């Protein structure tokens, strides 16, 4: 009884050894406290603790992403696969420097490329007009093939509007990336480069690539349906070249707004989808045509004006960003909508109508470039 009390104290249970009230004699107590037996008990106790109860030290592993922590929040629309590793910077504001420069640089390059594209497109249209006259004459004397599959495809393509033909390439790119998500061996690469996260090691390229990335079929179908519905209106307002510059820039700008919100709130997590860029398209059309009538899919009997729809969407995304709703990236939606409103109101005058100096420089470069024969013009 006396030795059991000492062992309990040795185990660290906080129980001090006391003399037994009954059931023991002075000789038993003296024998229990003898040096040889006490040392043997200590030795045996040490061996038992080492071999029987002490756990081996765990190997230190690098910290992985924790989907249950408050610092890591994942939307329900992103893939449930583990990212390689998240290491949020101890200086989170510094992580926004590279994305900021990338956003400004990419936006400038997008609009510059669109201006040059429009210049080349106008030149090619003049040339194709004369080529078309020659082609029509050849088709008149060439026997026509009836029921040709290629002819049916060309007929379908020619019946599309300019806006629908423009967004067809965007939809095809989204479908291709969606298929890549189905390849198990590519999921780590897809998470790294096709989802945007300010806590990731790769910050800049996902700002653009995530705009074409969808993991959920419903997410992709809903976004592409909205884009297809507004394609004719937005291309009629901006033109094909300017629309592409606005769409790509909107994807990067909305992702940067998402980065800022995640860093400010500390709720890191990957995001993906074209919703930010599509919100720019929707906001631009609703701002330009506020009295247009819109309806919800599957509920065509309920209609409302485009201006009221835009106000409701902005209010919902603002509430979601403030209250921390996690199903959508409300900061990206809000950033895309505000960019669309700003561009239609001010950006078109400030950016697109001041593209002439760049076009003149490009024209001079094309005019002064060497001919194919090697001489200069």
Curated annotation (Swiss-Prot):
The keyword Transmembrane helix applies. Its EC number is 3.4.21.105. The modification Phosphoserine is found at residues 65, 68. The gene is PARL. Interacts with PSEN1 and PSEN2. Binds OPA1. It is found in: Mitochondrion inner membrane. It comes from Bos taurus (Bovine). One of its GO terms (molecular function) is serine-type endopeptidase activity. PANTHER family: PRESENILIN-ASSOCIATED RHOMBOID-LIKE PROTEIN, MITOCHONDRIAL (PTHR43731:SF14), RHOMBOID PROTEASE (PTHR43731). This is Presenilin-associated rhomboid-like protein, mitochondrial. Residues 53-99, 186-205, 261-270, 317-330 are mitochondrial matrix.
């Amino acid at each position: 009884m006396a030795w059991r009390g000492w062992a309990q104290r040795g185990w660290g249970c906080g129980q001090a050894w006391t003399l037994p009230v009954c059931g023991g004699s002075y000789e038993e107590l003296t024998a229990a406290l003898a040096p040889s037996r006490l040392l043997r008990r200590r030795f045996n106790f040490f061996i038992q603790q080492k071999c029987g109860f002490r756990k081996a030290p765990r190997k230190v592993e690098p910290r992985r992403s924790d989907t249950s922590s408050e610092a890591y929040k994942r939307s329900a629309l992103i893939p449930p696969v583990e990212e390689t590793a998240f290491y949020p910077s101890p200086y989170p504001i510094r992580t926004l420097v590279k994305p900021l420069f990338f956003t400004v640089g990419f936006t400038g390059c997008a609009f510059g490329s669109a201006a040059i594209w429009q210049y080349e497109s106008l030149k090619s249209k003049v040339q194709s007009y004369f080529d078309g006259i020659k082609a029509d004459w050849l088709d008149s004397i060439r026997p026509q093939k009836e029921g040709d599959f290629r002819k049916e495809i060309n007929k379908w393509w020619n019946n599309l509007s300019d806006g629908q033909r423009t967004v067809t390439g965007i939809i095809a790119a989204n479908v291709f990336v969606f298929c890549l998500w189905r390849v198990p061996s590519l999921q780590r690469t897809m998470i790294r480069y096709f989802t945007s996260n300010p806590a990731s090691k790769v910050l800049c390229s996902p700002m653009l690539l995530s705009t074409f990335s969808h993991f959920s079929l419903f997410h992709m179908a809903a976004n592409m349906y909205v884009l297809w519905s507004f394609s004719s209106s937005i291309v009629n307002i901006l033109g094909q070249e300017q629309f592409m510059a606005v769409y790509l820039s909107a994807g990067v700008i909305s992702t940067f707004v998402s980065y800022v919100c995640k860093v400010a709130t500390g709720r890191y997590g990957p995001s993906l989808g074209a919703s930010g860029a599509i919100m720019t398209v929707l906001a631009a059309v609703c701002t330009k045509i506020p009295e247009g009538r819109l309806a919800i899919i599957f509920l065509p009997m309920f209609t409302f004006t485009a201006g009221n729809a835009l106000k409701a969407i902005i209010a919902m995304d603002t509430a979601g960003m403030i209250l921390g709703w996690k199903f959508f990236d409300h900061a990206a939606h809000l950033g895309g909508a505000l960019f669309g409103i700003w561009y239609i109101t001010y950006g078109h005058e400030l950016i697109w109508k001041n593209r002439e100096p760049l076009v003149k420089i490009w024209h001079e470069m094309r005019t002064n470039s060497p001919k194919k024969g090697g001489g200069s013009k």
